[in-house]
């Protein structure tokens, strides 16, 4: 979805007059249709596997995410991180650990910033955001994971 996010970002930016239409909508819509067709093929092939969850439509995921965070939050993974959490919650996955490598400050800000809003919309969610960088101690990670597991909601 990281690649597919760019189609939504462009639409949002053009509508907000943040970005000019350098490419015609016809070209971009065609690119989206081609990418979506390939995703549908992957979904069809992988559907044979018991635990496979099909890739959703990025525009539908963006619509759901607008309740939590502005789609103008495009730094790092931006609104995609909350979109994935919302998708998990809608599928009934209520225990989510978000691992952020190398101190990605943009993802750290979004993950911490949306935590309360996610819980307001999805009260059954058990959410933990862990940053992995050189300054994080193993004890801190283990303690936070143990606390997370103590709060697992069945």
Predicted regions and their residues:
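An N-terminal assembly and electron-transfer interface module characteristic of large anaerobic redox
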Residues: 1-154
């Amino acid at each position: 979805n990281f690649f597919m996010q760019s189609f939504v970002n462009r639409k949002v930016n053009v509508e907000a007059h943040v970005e000019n239409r350098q490419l015609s909508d016809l070209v971009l819509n065609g690119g989206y249709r081609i990418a979506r067709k390939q995703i549908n093929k992957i979904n069809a092939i992988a559907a044979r596997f018991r635990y496979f969850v099909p890739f959703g439509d990025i525009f539908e995921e963006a619509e759901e995410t607008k309740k939590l965070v502005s789609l103008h939050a495009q730094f790092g993974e931006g609104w995609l991180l909350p979109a994935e959490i919302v998708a998990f919650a809608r599928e009934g996955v209520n225990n989510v650990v978000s691992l952020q490598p190398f101190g990605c400050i943009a993802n750290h800000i979004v993950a911490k910033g949306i935590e309360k809003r996610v819980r307001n919309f999805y009260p059954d969610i058990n959410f933990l955001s862990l940053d992995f960088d050189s300054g994080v101690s193993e004890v801190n990670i283990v303690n936070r994971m143990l606390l997370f597991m103590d709060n697992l909601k069945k």
